[in-house]
Amino acid sequence: MNSDEYIFNIKDILNILPHRYPFLLIDRILDFKAFQYLKALKNCTVNEPFFQGHFIKEPVFPGVLMIEAMSQAAAVLIFKSIGKLNINQLYYFVGIENTRFKKIVVPGDQIFIEVIYLKSKKNFIKFKIFAIVNKKNVCKSTIIFYKKNIFN
C-alpha cells in the first residue's frame, strides 16, 4: 500500500484522537484490522516547528516525537477496534520497552508506522510498533497503554 491509498484521512483522525496542531503527528491511516494491526503515515515537512531548532543546520525529526507518533497510531488502533468511545475510560501511555532508533528522519521523509496488537492483560495493552522510511526500519519499540475506568 502506498501513501495515496488510505482508509482514514486527517478529518477522520481528528474525530478519533484528541490531539491537535502542533501535536497531532498522524496524517493518514493506510490499513487497519481491529485488534490486530494498523498502518499509518506521517509526512515530515520542514515547516513543522521543531525542525527550526532540532537542529538548525541539520534538521532531524526528534526521537521523542517518533515515539509519540507511534503511540498516536496505537491509540487509533485501540479506539477504532473498540468502536464507540467510552467517556468513562481513559487510556494512558505508561511504558516503552526495547526501543531502538536505527536511522535519522529528515524533512521530506514519509514515516510509515506499523502497529501490531500483541496482547491485553487486565487493563494493560501492549503493541509492537515499527517506523519505516524508504522501506528501511528507522525505529522499533514496544509500547504499553493502561486503560483506566473513571466515573462521573
From Swiss-Prot:
**Species of provenance:** Buchnera aphidicola subsp. Schizaphis graminum (strain Sg)
Q: Which UniProt keywords apply?
A: Cytoplasm, Lipid A biosynthesis, Lipid biosynthesis, Lipid metabolism, Lyase
| Name of the protein in its database record | 3-hydroxyacyl-[acyl-carrier-protein] dehydratase FabZ
Q: Which domain of life is it from?
A: Bacteria
Q: For this protein, what is the EC number?
A: 4.2.1.59
Which SUPFAM superfamilies does the entry link to? Thioesterase/thiol ester dehydrase-isomerase
GO molecular function, a single term: (3R)-hydroxyacyl-[acyl-carrier-protein] dehydratase activity
The protein's location, in the record's own words, is: Cytoplasm
